[in-house]
Amino acid sequence: MKIRPYQTEDRDAVIALWDACGLLRAWNNPYRDIERKLGVQPELFLVGIDANQRIIASAMAGFDGHRGWVNYLAVAPDKRRLSLGRQLMNEAERLLAERGCPKLNLQVRTGNLEVLEFYRKLGYVQDDVVSFGKRLIHDQTQA
């Protein structure tokens, strides 16, 4: 897998990947998420491509000056268990560390046991915190 920054022409393939991986939710419009990311540290929006130039993985990383974050880590279902997620996380960690990021945070849905174990194997530990959220912009996807 070759890792490179997201390009505008990747949009539909990336959203299809997210859909195949079960990452899409009605309350998060993926088109708007991508637009917003392209306005802030677009070089940290990564895709993985195979030898046929097919997008098979993605990660949307960012650094706010205090903590790094990774969202939308996805690996195509037919490419799992090949260490592609690990490769993408290693690259995101490297890029964030280059920017002086002292700690990387991420969120995983509590019922997603397979992904929880994936991150544990990468050395991530569960913090003793509760994640709160407040919707500031309502941008549900269209039905």
Question: What are the roles of these predicted feature ranges?
Answer:
Residues 106-115, 133-137:
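Conserved beta-strand-loop-alpha-helix junction that forms the acyl-donor binding cleft
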Residues 96-108:
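Conserved GNAT acetyl-CoA-binding A-motif
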Residues 1-2:
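Extreme N-terminal starter segment of soluble prokaryotic enzymes
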Residues 76-78, 82, 110-111:
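Active-site acidic-Proline motif in GNAT/NAT acetyltransferases
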Residues 79, 83-91:
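Conserved acetyl-CoA pyrophosphate-binding loop and the N-cap/start of the following alpha-helix
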Residues 69-72, 107, 118:
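Residue-level recognition of specific faces of alpha-helices
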Residues 5-72, 76, 90-91, 95, ...:
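Acetyl-CoA-dependent GNAT
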Residues 119, 124:
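Conserved active-site tyrosine of GNAT-family acetyltransferases
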